[in-house]
């Protein structure tokens, strides 16, 4: 009983929260449904007080009723029902509707009036009751309850009936009788309904439970798993659930049933077959999944997707993996004969079959006439004959002057189960000792931005004439990307090359004896470059010399006049914005130094026919007009996407000159991390500037859109690209002045390129990038600008380095706004007080230290861009250093870092003070654990000690050892 009560208590909350399935009632007797006399037994029968009558119920239906109003209250008056079969119920409910007269409303003769009656029951296996049996008394009858009225009738009052429901039981025999006994009550029995409650059939938790009669407080019912489900785990016990005595299911079921493979759960009570094109591989509550690529199902309720014809799964593939197919044949087999050694090379199949486990096998056939047999076992293959992962095999041990057929087969993981022969390509080779002499004298005849004309010296042949030549070329440094061209003459034209790029070229000759060796690689570049053809070298030298003399004279006169006119109002030569040309170095030329700015446009930007351009959509707006995406199709060249800046109508000459100045600037730069100028359109309206199209847009918005999606090494790669572009600009003596993440563009390969050179001279103010107006005029983006540029408009490459440090912070914070919501004046004040931005979350300590180096107050102390590129390269080569992050203060926001000068080393009284003084406090715990707990221990530390402690960065080792040397020199003044 205690266990049952515990189950009931435990299930109470579950019943309330999940809702109850209504109990089902089975009626054993209902007098309201009787249409004839009830023929109940009345006692005493000689002078019966109970009287059967016809009446109307509350709905106006005719019903049979009994009423009694005895004058003598000393006599008991009984009324007994007919035999009622119990139908297996262990207890029943009796619903009684009756009225009762109030005793005070009765005449005085009813002095012993009562306002209650008693209900009894008697059990029997047969209908044996009579007028005298059983005896009309409490025993053998069992008393159920004394029933009192809630509403009493009085003369002239409201007529209201009473409804009472009582429970009768326990019942054990086939049926029972109900008996009503009154003694002095004046009442009417309007209706009697006898029923019992049972738990209805229900499905829960993928288990089906039958209709259940409760025989006790709770009755355990056994169920079965619903259709298309089965028990999970090792248990085979059927599901169970408890049925309460009130006909309600109690608590959740105990069930391990779950949907079978090929079926998914629906509403937690049934399993539905997976549709065509879907599958489910295991028993459980997971949903059906779409079939992997190249597979399908043939019927609903599938547990596995079958591969489409021609596709297979390897024995090592998982059952739910995509189906793949064997690869297509290898392409372009190239061979080289050296005596009796053959080297085979080939290109990758066009179709890898959807797999990465591609390998190759080489078959050799020895042919004499029309008869071919397998090659001898003495032939060797390097690196192997079967399952070769690469695309090059060297075959040794061949016979001279013999014809061989070599077949290269492409295979992958499903080739063995495909029951088809691997795709292959074959080549016939005849060995000979009389091979062609190597080619020499390779030279460039003519070059353009996308093509090169090459010729070479015809090699002398002693026995066989040269049939043709084979040339191979690739970008310099990419030895695995060779492309091949054949030529019958000693020259060839290579097209579709990258501009301003260096290529390595090799040539070999073929005779009747086969191909000779490739020549040594020769480096040849496309335009623009600084080379001149030999035929024009002398003329070019003379013209250059004359031009330099004239230019030097003009520059001297211009500088003299300029300094004379500006000496009083501008004593600092850096403020003029002019850039002097270096010795033998290509430098930037300011287009505003031209008397006619249009001449600068013609010199540095290529004019493009407007018919070559197709504008597709507007992607933004700039200072001068709209920015669009379009296509550029120059005849003879591949169509490319371009970004198009347009000059809005109604412009002034100055606006047109300022708009095109950016093209004059951009056209001077050729670098993979500088936005590339395709050309300009000035001969028609609107005037346009065309640049390469960068799919991912501005870096700041791209990072915010992909917050947290990139690893530190990827972010460092982006920063390295930006630094490389700025290194190129600084070497060109160009100062950007507005370096920020919003002015860095990102292409589909995550390559970052510096852009927006017009803003280096014309900065506008807007709500997202507020600027500060200096006393000298002009707008400056405060948050990105070095303090000397804010105060004195002193823009140099060092001020660009400061801005680059802010860009680093933007990148590592995924586009966070520098200095958050601080005002411009607060930013200026904080920088003047030597406060700097803290490291972004999860920022490697080495990167934040590089930021702090870029934010040195003295511009001469900041690193150059070449040093920044080298530092980032070291981090990329040592990814482990990016796992060390700085300590970030707790709290809702990160305060600015105090970068004021540390105290002198002589004031350091502990190891912790010393490490903080040299900004190496990150190693404090490591020093303590290694036993360096006092200053006197530090003076004897070595490089080996630092490695043992965990200081692996060369820069940190150098900084610590340098400080240790200082401690040794000033050891006498240290306080221990």
UniProtKB/Swiss-Prot annotation:
Annotated S-S bridges: 69-186, 103-113
InterPro entries: Eph_TM, Ephrin_rcpt_lig-bd_dom, Ephrin_rcpt_TKs, FN3_dom, FN3_sf, Galactose-bd-like_sf, Ig-like_fold, Kinase-like_dom_sf
Domain Protein kinase: from-to ranges: 613-897
Subcellular localization, as worded in the UniProt entry: Cell membrane
Catalysis performed (reactions): L-tyrosyl-[protein] + ATP = O-phospho-L-tyrosyl-[protein] + ADP + H(+)
Extracellular side: 24-541
EC numbers on record: 2.7.10.1
GO molecular function: ATP binding; ephrin receptor activity; transmembrane receptor protein tyrosine kinase activity
Residue ranges occupied by any Fibronectin type-III domain in the UniProt entry: 326-434, 438-529
SUPFAM superfamilies per the UniProt record, alphabetical: Fibronectin type III, Galactose-binding domain-like, Protein kinase-like (PK-like), SAM/Pointed domain
Cytoplasmic side: 563-976
Keyword Coiled coil (UniProt): no
GO BP terms, alphabetized: ephrin receptor signaling pathway; Kupffer's vesicle development; somitogenesis
Top enzyme class: transferase
Function comment: Receptor tyrosine kinase which binds promiscuously transmembrane ephrin-B family ligands residing on adjacent cells, leading to contact-dependent bidirectional signaling into neighboring cells. The signaling pathway downstream of the receptor is referred to as forward signaling while the signaling pathway downstream of the ephrin ligand is referred to as reverse signaling.
Protein name (Swiss-Prot/TrEMBL): Ephrin type-B receptor 4b
């Amino acid at each position: 009983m205690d266990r049952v009560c515990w189950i009931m208590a435990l299930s109470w909350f579950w019943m309330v929260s999940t809702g109850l399935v209504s109990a089902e009632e089975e009626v054993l007797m209902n007098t309201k449904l009787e249409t004839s006399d009830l023929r109940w037994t009345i006692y005493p029968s000689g002078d019966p007080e109970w009287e059967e009558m016809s009446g109307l119920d509350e709905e106006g239906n005719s019903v049979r009723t009994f009423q009694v109003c005895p004058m003598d209250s000393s006599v008991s008056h009984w009324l007994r029902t007919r035999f009622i079969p119990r139908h297996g119920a262990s207890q029943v409910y009796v619903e009684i509707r009756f009225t009762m007269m109030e005793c005070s409303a009765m005449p005085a003769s009813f002095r012993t009036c009562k306002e209650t009656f008693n209900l009894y029951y008697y059990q029997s296996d047969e209908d044996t009751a009579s007028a005298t049996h059983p005896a009309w008394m409490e025993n053998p009858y069992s008393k159920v309850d004394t029933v009192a009225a809630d509403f009493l009738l009085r003369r002239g009052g409201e007529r209201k009936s009473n409804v009472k429901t009582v429970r009768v039981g326990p019942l054990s025999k086939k049926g029972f009788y109900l008996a009503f006994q009154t003694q002095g009550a004046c009442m009417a029995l309007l209706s009697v309904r006898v029923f019992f409650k049972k738990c209805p059939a229900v499905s829960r938790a993928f288990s089906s439970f039958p209709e259940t009669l409760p025989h006790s407080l709770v009755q355990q019912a056994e169920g079965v798993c619903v259709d298309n489900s089965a028990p999970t785990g090792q248990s085979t016990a059927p599901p169970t659930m408890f049925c309460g005595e009130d006909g309600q299911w109690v608590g959740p079921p105990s069930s391990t049933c779950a949907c079978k493979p090929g079926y998914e759960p629906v509403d937690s009570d049934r399993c539905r077959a997976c549709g065509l094109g879907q599958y489910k591989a295991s028993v459980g509550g997971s949903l059906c999944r779409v079939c992997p690529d190249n597979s399908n199902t043939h019927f609903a309720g599938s547990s596995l997707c079958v591969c489409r014809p021609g596709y297979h799964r390897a024995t090592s593939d998982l059952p739910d993996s995509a189906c793949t197919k064997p690869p297509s044949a290898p392409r372009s087999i190239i061979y080289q004969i050296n005596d009796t050694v053959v080297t085979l090379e080939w290109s990758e199949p066009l179709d890898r079959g959807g797999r990465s486990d591609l390998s190759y096998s080489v078959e050799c056939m020895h042919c004499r006439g029309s008869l071919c047999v397998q090659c001898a076992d003495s032939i060797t293959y390097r690196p192997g004959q079967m399952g070769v992962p690469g695309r090059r095999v060297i075959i040794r041990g061949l016979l001279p002057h013999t014809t061989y057929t070599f077949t290269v087969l492409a295979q992958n993981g499903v080739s063995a189960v495909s029951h088809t022969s691997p795709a292959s390509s074959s080549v016939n080779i005849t060995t000979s000792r009389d091979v062609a002499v190597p080619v020499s004298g390779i030279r460039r005849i003519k070059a353009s931005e996308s093509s090169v004309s090459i010729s070479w010296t015809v090699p002398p042949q002693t026995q066989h004439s040269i049939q043709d030549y084979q040339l191979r070329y690739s970008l310099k440094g990419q030895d695995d990307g060779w492309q091949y061209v054949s030529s019958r003459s000693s020259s060839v034209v290579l097209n579709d090359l990258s501009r301003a790029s260096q290529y390595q070229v090799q040539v070999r000759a073929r005779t009747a004896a086969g191909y000779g060796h490739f020549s040594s690689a020769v480096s040849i570049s496309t335009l623009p470059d600084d080379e001149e053809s030999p035929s024009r070298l002398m003329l070019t030298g003379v013209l250059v010399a004359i031009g330099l003399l004239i230019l030097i004279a003009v520059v001297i006169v211009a500088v003299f006049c300029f300094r004379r006119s500006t000496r009083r109002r501008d004593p600092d030569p850096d403020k003029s914005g002019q850039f002097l040309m270096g010795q033998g170095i290509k430098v930037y030329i300011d287009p505003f130094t031209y008397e006619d700015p249009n001449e600068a446009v013609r010199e540095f930007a290529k004019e493009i026919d407007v018919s070559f351009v197709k504008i597709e959509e507007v992607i933004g707006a700039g200072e001068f007009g709209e920015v669009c995406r379009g296509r550029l199709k120059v005849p003879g060249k591949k169509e490319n996407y371009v970004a198009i800046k347009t000059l809005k109508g109604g412009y002034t000459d100055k606006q047109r000159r300022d708009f095109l100045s950016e093209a004059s600037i951009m056209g001077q730069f050729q670098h993979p991390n500088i936005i590339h100028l395709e050309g300009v359109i000035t001969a028609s309206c609107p005037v346009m500037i065309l640049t390469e199209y960068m799919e991912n847009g501005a870096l700041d918005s791209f990072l915010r859109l992909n917050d947290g999606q990139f690893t530190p090494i990827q972010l460092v790669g982006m920063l390295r690209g930006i630094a490389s572009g700025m290194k190129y600009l600084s070497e060109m003596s160009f100062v950007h002045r507005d370096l920020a993440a919003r002015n860095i563009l990102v292409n589909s390969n995550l390559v970052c390129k510096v852009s927006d050179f017009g803003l280096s001279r014309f900065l506008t103010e807007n709500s997202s990038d507020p600027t500060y107006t200096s006393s000298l005029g002009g707008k400056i983006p405060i948050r990105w600008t070095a303090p000397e540029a804010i105060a004195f408009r002193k823009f140099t490459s060092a001020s660009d380095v400061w801005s680059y440090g802010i860009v680093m912070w933007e990148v590592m914070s995924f586009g966070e706004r520098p200095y958050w919501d601080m005002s411009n004046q607060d930013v200026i004040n904080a920088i003047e007080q030597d406060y700097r931005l803290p490291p972004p979350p999860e920022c490697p300590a080495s990167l934040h230290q590089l930021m702090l180096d870029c934010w040195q107050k003295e511009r001469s102390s900041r690193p150059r861009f070449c040093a920044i590129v080298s530092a980032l390269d070291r981090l990329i080569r040592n990814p482990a250093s990016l796992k060390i992050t700085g300590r970030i203060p707790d709290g809702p926001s990160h305060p600015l870092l105090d970068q004021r000068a540390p105290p002198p080393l002589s004031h350091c009284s502990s190891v912790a003070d010393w490490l903080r003084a040299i900004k190496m406090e990150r190693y404090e715990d490591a020093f303590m654990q290694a036993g360096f707990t006092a200053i006197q221990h530090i003076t004897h530390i070595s490089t080996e000690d630092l490695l043992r402690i965990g200081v692996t960065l060369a820069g940190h080792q150098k900084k610590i050892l340098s400080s240790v040397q200082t401690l040794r020199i000033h050891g006498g003044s240290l306080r221990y």
